[in-house]
């Protein structure tokens, strides 16, 4: 939670214990206790992430990831301060794949988008592409 709050600037929208029913979630068992934190961006309609921690019993940590593979998740985020986000990420001790760099890509409407992009891993080894658009 601290990484998403202090580095990426998200705020807590929900934070509570959830006891699993054993039905809806494809992990854990009935009665397992979890903590669910939902973080929101400036626009919660298109920018929320749920962080689920198994608290009782604790589940083993997955092995660290160094590269993306088939089926892996990439979080794509947009903000207005790629340089500041990079500085906060370095101060936090996050693994940086690529510091802020200029990037151009064709947008959904066919027009070129100019961005400063930052590529990094969160503390749970999920890959994040943080983009600052220059319109």
Task: Please annotate each region the language model reported.
Residues 130-135:
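Short beta->alpha transition motifs characteristic of CBS
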Residues 1-46, 91, 111:
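Core segments of cupin and vicinal oxygen chelate
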